[in-house]
């Protein structure tokens, strides 16, 4: 499917079901490869409780996914967004942005200080994310890519810890 056709085709973004796990994992592996296991963000996700999983469906096929994970930044309760995955044949059509927007909307309904992520600033700034250089992740990360979307708290400082 082309990106132009995708824009005219509504995709359902729905909560992830337990039966979706294998398809989501395959999508994440295709997008990030096995190298993702070496990333600091993956260390956080391995220890944190998933608070939300969303998938994008094109018919019966899962073509996108995104998750929120329970964390704290300093003393501020928050959620950690990622990974965002979109099937190769559905990229460039805005689906990644739709998934981020759905997560942001869900996070604003939670009692959290905000949403933290590690990502490309020019992409995420359009959703309201701002630099969070003093949020200290438990491993190496490019601080310029650590971003915060305030929900109930300004940009926090301190260590990022997973909440099980």
Predicted feature locations:
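Short, solvent-exposed loop/turn elements at beta->coil junctions and helix N-caps
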Residues: 41-46, 135-137
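Conserved beta-strand in the GNAT
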Residues: 55, 61-71, 77-85
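Non-DNA-binding regulatory cores of transcription-related proteins
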Residues: 133-150, 159-164
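Conserved acetyl-CoA-binding loop-helix of GNAT-fold acetyltransferases
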Residues: 86, 92-105, 117
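Conserved active-site alpha-helix within GNAT-family acetyltransferase domains
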Residues: 109-113, 118-143
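Short amphipathic alpha-helix that is part of the acyltransferase structural core
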Residues: 2-40, 47-62, 153-164
């Amino acid at each position: 499917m082309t990106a132009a056709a995708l824009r005219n085709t509504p995709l359902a973004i729905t909560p992830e079901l337990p039966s979706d796990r294998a398809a989501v994992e395959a999508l994440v592996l295709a997008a990030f490869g096995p190298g993702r296991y070496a990333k600091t963000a993956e260390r956080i996700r391995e220890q944190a409780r998933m608070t939300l999983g969303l998938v994008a469906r094109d018919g019966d096929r899962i073509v996108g996914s995104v998750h929120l994970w329970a964390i704290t930044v300093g003393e501020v309760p928050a959620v950690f967004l990622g990974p965002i995955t979109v099937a190769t044949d559905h990229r460039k059509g805005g689906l990644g942005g739709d998934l981020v927007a759905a997560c942001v909307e869900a996070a604003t309904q939670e009692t959290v200080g905000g949403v933290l992520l590690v990502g490309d600033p020019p992409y995420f700034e359009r959703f309201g994310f701002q630099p969070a250089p003093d949020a200290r992740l438990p491993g190496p990360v490019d601080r310029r890519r650590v971003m915060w979307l305030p929900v109930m708290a300004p940009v926090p400082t301190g260590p990022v810890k997973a909440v099980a």
